[in-house]
């Protein structure tokens, strides 16, 4: 009897570990651009950050047109949530993600509609309502309770602090060096042109 119980426990633990490993395999870095690009930009962002939304509205479209679509730059979006609403949005953005950045752009374009609420629960409800209106198909409960995704998001933040001393958003890293100029397209373009 004890052997049977032990065998069942081992099977359950092994099955859960296998599921966890499978979940880890589907977590993909959100990025755009060629993997062979000479320049890699890493952006540390909080989905509730107004300056991050401004970057996506006013800088990113030109960056994409002039550098990313031409194969010169690859951009990777890293999570650096500054509050619980951003943390939950990061988990949702990473859940069932195929590596494309569409959901990130959707969240920034409607940031003022969902990134509000007096409680974390209210902000999460606003997020769910906003994405439902946008026809984004996500299992909210499953995504928000997924420990692997939670760890993935938190590890982005930890790595940002340890490796690049990130303390604000957005923080732009270009080929492993922090971009320390005012974040506008003119400055970014000038910097990138020197690297090409």
Residue ranges of each PLM-predicted region?
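Cysteine-centric redox/oxidoreductase cores and disulfide-bonded domains
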Residues: 81-168, 173-186, 190-196
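Extracytoplasmic thiol/disulfide redox context detector
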Residues: 2-83, 87, 149-163, 194-196
